[in-house]
Amino acid sequence: MRREEIIRRLKAYFEPRERFRIVILFGSVARGDIKRESDVDLAVLAEPALSLRELLRLMGELEDLCGRRADVVQLQDLCEDKPAVAFEVTREGIPLKIVDREEWLRLRERIWHHYLDTEYLRRLNWRYFKEALRRRRAGASSALTQQPQAA
């Protein structure tokens, strides 16, 4: 199914469902980089928030609708748990439904501030990870050069 058809179907699905205040398509489908294994990635703001059961049911309905796997994340969780992903959703995502533009702009602003406020921590974490990886590789290569002598 082509990107335009997926977008049309998703808009038609969410439009009458008042519980969904914000729906954003992101990922490979939003970028137009659809491959056979691509899934449909959506970020939603529902009032009230979806339970796990409701989230799983929604993903199943969307998979049937789009003919491919669907991953749905709740924006309120994404903002705090994964600020880099939330930032990408707001930066590159395609809004499919925005009930209140002011609410969307406030949420975007909160996500961007949180992303920028935590950027230093992500860089620090990345630096520690690379250093640990470098030490591990150095340890592995020295172990290879110190092979036991034949008796």
Regions found by a protein language model. Give the residues of each.
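Short glycine/proline-enriched turns and hinge-like loops at secondary-structure junctions
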Residues: K35-S38
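Short hydrophobic/aromatic beta-strand micro-patches
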Residues: A43-L45
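Short gly/ser-rich loop at a beta-strand->alpha-helix junction or flexible surface loop bordering the NTP-binding
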Residues: R21-V29
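A structural signal for isolated positions on well-ordered beta-strands in alpha/beta enzyme cores
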Residues: I24, D41, D71-V73
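Catalytic core of pol beta-like nucleotidyltransferases
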Residues: M1-R19, R31-G32, E47-A151
